[in-house]
Swiss-Prot record:
This is Protein Wnt-1. Ligand for members of the frizzled family of seven transmembrane receptors. Acts in the canonical Wnt signaling pathway by promoting beta-catenin-dependent transcriptional activation. Developmental protein that promotes cell proliferation in the developing spinal cord. Has a role in osteoblast function, bone development and bone homeostasis. PANTHER family: PROTO-ONCOGENE WNT-1 (PTHR12027:SF91), WNT RELATED (PTHR12027). Residues 1-25 form the signal peptide. Keywords: Developmental protein, Disulfide bond, Extracellular matrix, Lipoprotein, Secreted, Signal, Wnt signaling pathway. Belongs to the Wnt family. It comes from Gallus gallus.
Length: 368
């Protein structure tokens, strides 16, 4: 009896250790998100003629490779932080009417425990934050904010019968390369979660790339536009968020695939396969997940869900923002509040605007 009991205890201990190790690995994969609170606009400090890295508290959350990348690209820290801030705002906008509305908190793991799960929401978080870094860095290059990159000047010469390449194209290639080196370096291991995170990181970057658009400026007598100068411009980040939100809704559930044990092609051995064999394998643009999402209806410290109690809902909507769905069938309360706003504004020449104060009564519905 003692032998089997000891064996079971050892197995349980090993399982617990593995779970703890997984939790640490998951938390580390998103530690760099903590730099969102880095306030400085530069990562450089000149001291006695030498350039040194500012020891911001948030930088302690970065890996050695990430700190090296920041050091090698003066000015890029602000771009990374700005890109992450854009990603958070976009995430909260896209999910503002959902049970999970992309809540954030102070601290290194700004998205909370939901990133410990392999669900759709985690997939979107990784994709949108990766896209945010790529988008912000590419734009900063063309703005001259980063010392190690400039506009993309590779497109030069004739582009068509009535236009040619010129101007300052946003440097999407530098943005993608830096984003891959910086963001992906926080992922460790070869398990399903590792593959999922890397796939969604790349999907975010590819979305920024695929949404690039050509812009042109006309030249000619009296605006005749006989010749046009064109360049490549980044999409708005709202456009990136819209595309990723559509891919969130159509995300592919995957399992861990293994092609064999050929050491010569070890990188290709581990891959993602659709859970349903009848489905097509996910494309590089698709978001992937491997775990069903919680219902997000109630608070759970273990799951990292805040619940929907107290959330504002639309009593007349049959959609996801409606009280029936958002409140998970628990019902809702109705209250009124008086709001004073500026109204009936008039412009007086020159240059003054006068307004009245109007008080309105608003009807609010909140989930129980």
């Amino acid at each position: 009896m003692r032998g089997p009991a000891l064996l079971l205890a050892l197995r349980a201990l090993c399982a617990l250790s593995a779970l703890r190790g997984t939790a640490r690995a998951v938390n580390n994969s998103g530690r760099w998100w903590g730099i969102i609170n880095v306030a400085s606009s530069t990562n450089l400090l000149t001291d006695s003629g030498s350039v040194q890295l500012v020891l911001e508290p948030g930088l302690q959350l970065l890996s050695r490779k990430q700190r090296r990348l920041i050091r090698q690209n003066p000015g890029i820290l602000h771009s990374v932080s700005a890109g992450l801030q854009s990603a958070v705002r976009e995430c909260q906008w896209q999910f503002r009417n959902r049970r999970w509305n992309c809540p954030t908190s102070q601290g290194p793991n700004i998205f909370g425990k939901i990133v410990n799960r392999g669900c759709r929401e985690t997939a979107f978080i990784f994709a949108i934050t990766s896209a945010g870094v790529t988008h912000s860095v590419a734009r900063s290059c063309s703005e001259g904010s980063i010392e190690s990159c400039t506009c993309d000047y590779r497109r030069r010469g004739p582009g068509g019968p009535d236009w040619h390449w010129g101007g300052c194209s946003d440097n999407i290639d530098f943005g993608r390369l830096f984003g891959r080196e910086f963001v992906d370096s926080s992922e460790k291991g070869r398990d399903l979660r590792f593959l999922m995170n890397l796939h969604n990181n790349e999907a975010g970057r590819m979305t920024v790339f695929s949404e690039m658009r050509q812009e042109c400026k006309c030249h000619g007598m009296s605006g005749s536009c006989t010749v046009r100068t064109c360049w490549m411009r980044l999409p708005t980040f709202r456009a990136v968020g819209d595309v990723l939100k559509d891919r969130f809704d159509g995300a592919s559930r995957v399992i861990y695939g293994n092609k064999g044990s050929n050491r010569a092609s070890r990188v290709e051995l581990h891959h993602l396969e659709p859970e349903n064999p009848a489905h097509k394998p996910p494309s590089p643009h698709d978001l992937v997940y491997f775990e069903k999402s919680p219902n997000f209806c109630t608070y759970s410290g273990k799951m990292g869900t805040a619940g929907t109690a107290g959330r504002a809902c639309n009593s007349s909507s049959p959609g996801l923002d409606g009280c029936e769905l958002l409140c998970c069938g628990r019902g809702f309360r109705t209250r009124t509040q008086r709001v004073t706003e500026r109204c009936n504004c008039t412009f007086h020449w020159c240059c003054h605007v006068s307004c009245l104060n109007c008080t309105n009564t608003q009807v609010l519905h909140e989930c129980l």
